[in-house]
Amino acid sequence: MDKKTIIGVVLMSLIFIGYMLYSSKQQAEYQQYLEQVQAEEVATAQANENNEAEQAQAEASAEQDAESAQEREQSIYGDYLAAARQAEAQKFTMSNDYLTVDFSTLGGVMSKITLDEYTKFAPKDERTEKVVLYDPSTAKFDLSFYIKQGLNNLPINTSEYVFTSEGVRREGDAQRLVMQLEVAAGAFLQYEYVLYDEKNPSRDYMLDFNIKLVNLSPIMAQQSTLGIEWANRTYQNERSFKTENMYTTLSYHLPGEESVEDLGMSEDSKSKQVQSEVNWVAFRQQFFSQAFIAHNNFAYSDMGFTTESKDSGFIKSYSARLGLPYNAQTTEYNFSFYCGPNKYAVLSDVVGPDGEKIAMERLIPLGGWLVGWFNRWIVIPVFDFLSKYIGSFGIIILILTILVKLLIFPLTYKSYLSTAKLRVIKPEMDALNEKYPREEDAMKKQQAMMNLYKKAGINPLGGCLPMLIQLPLLWALFRFFPVSIELRAQRFLWADDLSSYDSVLNLPFTIPFYGDHVSLFCLLMGAAMIGFSMFTYNQQSAQPQMAGMKFMMVYMMPVMMLFWFNDYASGLCYYYLLSQLITMIQMTAIRRFVDDDKIHAMMERNANKQKNKKKSKFQLRYEELMRQQEEMMRQQEKANGKRR
């Protein structure tokens, strides 16, 4: 064997031995991998078996828990109430020309109330969303009472149970929905709702609600009252949160009273307990109300509200806890819900079960005795009459303003005559001021002025009388315009809604005490006030009391009104604008027909008559009083001189 062959055999042997060693190592690693995979598969299979066993055990345990929970619930509430807690709720709807009411058998309640004739505020032609008074996400109605359970009493809250119902039935001009909650065999609680369709708003905005206790007396626990918890959160429906909140509150009526009580307006939160009987409770908004009326009165009421944040989309959250008198003989309670607009003609026709007045129209805050009387018997009837023939409420406000100005024109004429007389005798008044320049002579000057007025036939208050007469009227309209639903959503010129402010410019910032918008009607009213004030000041500057009042009268008051009225109803600003323009026209016309020379001649004749006229007892007493005051001042001056 040669050398090359030996080397080749050795190399081949080494390669073979190396390959065998490498292969055995790979085989060992592969075997280890297989054993690991098999172990993992065994572990996974065992885990799956364990999980399946645990799941089966959990399902069995859940079934046992459900069965035991159901058994416990049945043992606590009985078969009927336990089933009512688990049942699936149904929904029903009743509607007429004015409103749509949705119902849910969960709690047997109204779940939503929609006013079909009214929409929420929206810019220009986007006003399509209807006003919703009652929404399931915000509202609650719960009747609570106790039933016997062995030696204990079990509280029942109807909001936790699903009632049964056969649906809505129509009976003539009415739709009827009956829902009942079976408490025990043959014993049940029944709710009956009746919605009318009589084409009469005072009836069709009403929803009768009757509660019947059928064979419940044997299982009812001893209790003097049943409780109703009524709650709701009202949506913002108008443009201005500030104004709508100002007129949104909780109101209530005591039996036999002509007035309505409320918890105050613009409060952040307020609550009140009334331990006496209450006829009805209302969640009142600026233009709409939900009133819960008890035909036989509530035994007591515990009520309150809280104001929501400006950007929440809501105005206030209401709650009322109401008591129903109960004894073993009680089988039925009768109520009515009013869900509709704060419209005087509608609310004044809402009556009690015997046809008696229940003061629902007093929900509208028209003002106190004199102001409220003027609104109820003059302003509202005129508006209602004119609206039958005129479609534009801007024109109606113009006509109302003209009628008012014609009504008080005689007083305006006398006021101008009084001002003209003062202008004629101004030289004599200036002479008296020069004659009595000292403060000590104030009584003498006043007496001399009064004698001058008397001789000229001037009433010192003649110029103020028309304004004093107009004050109740101005205040009445100030109360009427922001709560008049007749003006709501009524357009005129550039104003989208005469019941709210007209914004011709929305500011990117807020001016303190003014707001974040510019009301054009308010600006025009302010300009008219400045013009009217300057006109009046020039006419009345002869009066001593007018001296030094120019800045306050001509400039300060209009600017203050500009800040005050920027957020008020555009219809109100429009009325005040018209009122001042018409008054200036009247005064200008009177001035053209009144001759100062004729007035002076008339005053001379009056002075001659006064010389021959016997003084009245009042005049004699007044002159005597003036002499006594003058004598007292003279003695006081002497005493002061001696002390010095």
Could you describe each region identified by the protein language model?
Residues M1-L406, H600-R644:
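Membrane-protein biogenesis/insertion across secretory and organellar systems
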Residues K3, I390-F393, F563-C573:
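Transmembrane helix interruption/hinge and helix-loop junction motifs
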Residues G8-L21, L474-L477, L523-A528, V559-M560:
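Core hydrophobic alpha-helical membrane-spanning segments
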Residues S13, G394, L398, L468, ...:
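Residue-level signal for the membrane-embedded core of alpha-helical transmembrane segments
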Residues Q26, L407-L474, I530-F565, L581-G641:
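Membrane-interface amphipathic helices and adjacent TM-edge segments
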Residues R362-K435, K444, M450, K454, ...:
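Transmembrane alpha-helical segments that form the functional core of multipass membrane systems
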Residues I390-L400, H517-F521, M549-M553:
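Membrane-interface starts of transmembrane alpha-helices
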Residues A476-I530:
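Conserved catalytic motifs of ABC-family nucleotide-binding domains
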